[in-house]
Curated annotation (Swiss-Prot):
Gene3D superfamilies attached to this UniProt entry: DnaJ domain (1.10.287.110)
Pfam families: DnaJ, DUF1977
Source organism per UniProt: Mus musculus (Mouse)
UniProt entry tagged with the keyword Protein transport: no
Gene label: Dnajb14
SUPFAM superfamilies recorded: Chaperone J-domain
Keyword Endoplasmic reticulum appears in the UniProt entry: yes
Protein name as it appears in the record: DnaJ homolog subfamily B member 14
Top-level taxonomic group: Eukaryota
Main localization of the protein described in the UniProt heading: endoplasmic reticulum
Description of how the protein assembles with itself and partners: Interacts (via J domain) with HSPA8/Hsc70. Forms a multiprotein complex, at least composed of DNAJB12, DNAJB14, HSPA8/Hsc70 and SGTA; interaction with DNAJB14 and HSPA8/Hsc70 is direct.
GO biological process: chaperone cofactor-dependent protein refolding; protein-containing complex assembly
Length: 379
């Protein structure tokens, strides 16, 4: 189950990269694959937005900088009359500053998008497309533009989801609905924890970002996701990267090589235990025995009985039982975690079949742990 989860997370990451590159079809395929492997909320949230918006994504025209222009140059789509310059000398207009202040002063998501409380999906999409392009940090360099962009993304994420919109309408304001406004991402099923970033949402609508070299990070306190736009590299830079590539790979692999060497040395220096919880023909531990106290089955070699008697045998059996109980306890925890995850996913996605599957899990290790606990109490 955990292996499937890792593969599902890889698929989600590939989907994010595809969205950044403007390839929505590829992103959709990998998100659907992730859904089949493991029910990740992030995959479901991204897929819902893609499916809901259909072919509208990417239909709007981006306001791009002309080829060869630098970050210090004024965007071709900007208004005349700048009111100042942001970091790196990036210019912004008075209208942009006023727009950012207006968005950040809004007390609820309907005000942010400029729609009424009975606005439908098309109204929300139209409002989001207009505002997202206007306040994207690659186009709008006014102070606070990044926060405004996050706010617009969260507003659409909440209001476009019927359940979250209903829940939000009960609270009445953004502050009550989400105590962490600057988290930057909104969870479609668990309050304001992150499932989809403002950049992911933007990429779904517009099929990629603006062609600049800037990086915008949106964090929710647990994990940070960065969206980096593509840089143009000269031929000389590519040659330097290739020359340094081999050495960089070696440096990255050094910790792994050291760990492998330490592990091998440890195995050579430490003698094998005189028992195994499972039959091991390679070490000759194939003779079945059972502890006197808890009745735990273990396996030893043919010379064991002659070497371990009396007190030595008692110490070995105590060690066997401790290893066995630890193993059972760990496996029981994994079983409970798996069942909890499946029950939660079934509740979130309203999947009755998944709920029945979770209820039907055998929990063999937990049953064995209960048996051992009762023996301890009985003793």
């Amino acid at each position: 189950m955990e292996g499937n989860r890792d593969e599902a997370e890889k698929c989600v990451q590939i989907a994010r990269e595809a969205l950044s590159a403007g390839n929505r079809d590829k992103a959709q395929r990998f998100l659907q694959k992730a859904e089949k492997l493991y029910p990740l909320p992030a995959a479901r949230a991204l897929l819902e937005i893609i499916m809901k918006n259909g072919s509208t994504a990417g239909s709007s025209t981006h306001c791009r900088k002309p080829p060869g222009s630098s970050d210090q140059s004024k965007p071709s789509c900007g208004k005349d009359g700048t009111s100042g310059a942001g970091e790196g000398g990036k210019v912004y207009t008075k209208d942009q500053v006023e727009g950012v202040l207006s968005i950040n002063k809004c007390k609820n998501y309907y005000e942010v998008l400029g729609v009424t409380k009975d606005a439908g999906d098309e109204d929300l999409k139209k409002a989001y497309r207009k505002l997202a392009l206007k306040f994207h940090p690659d186009k709008n360099h006014a102070p606070g533009a990044t926060d405004a962009f996050k706010k617009i993304g969260n507003a659409y994420a909440v209001l476009s989801n019927p359940e979250k919109r209903k829940q939000y309408d009960l609270t009445g304001s953004e502050e009550q609905a989400c105590n962490h406004q600057n988290n930057g991402r909104f969870n479609f099923h668990r309050g304001c924890e992150a499932d989809i970033t403002p950049e992911d949402l933007f990429n779904i609508f517009f099929g990629g970002g603006f062609p600049s070299g800037s990086v915008h990070s949106f964090s929710n306190g647990r994990a940070a996701y960065s969206h980096q736009h593509q840089h143009r590299h000269s031929g000389h830079e590519r040659e330097e990267e290739r020359a340094d590539g081999g050495f960089s790979v070696f440096i990255q692999l050094m910790p792994i090589i050291v760990l492998i060497l330490v592990s091998l040395l440890s195995q050579l220096m430490v003698s094998n235990p005189p028992y195994s919880l499972y039959p091991r023909s390679g070490s000759g531990q194939t003779i079945k025995m059972q502890t006197e106290n808890l009745g735990v089955v273990y396996y030893v070699s043919k010379d064991f009985k002659s070497e371990y008697k009396g007190t030595l045998l008692q110490k070995v059996e105590k060690s066997v039982e401790e290893d066995y109980v630890t193993n059972i306890r760990n496996n029981c925890w994994k079983e409970r975690q798996q069942k909890t995850d499946m029950q939660y996913a079934a509740k979130v996605y309203r999947d009755e079949q998944l709920r029945r599957k979770a209820d039907a899990l055998s929990m063999e290790n937990c049953k064995e742990l209960e048996r051992l606990t009762s023996l301890y109490k009985g003793g």
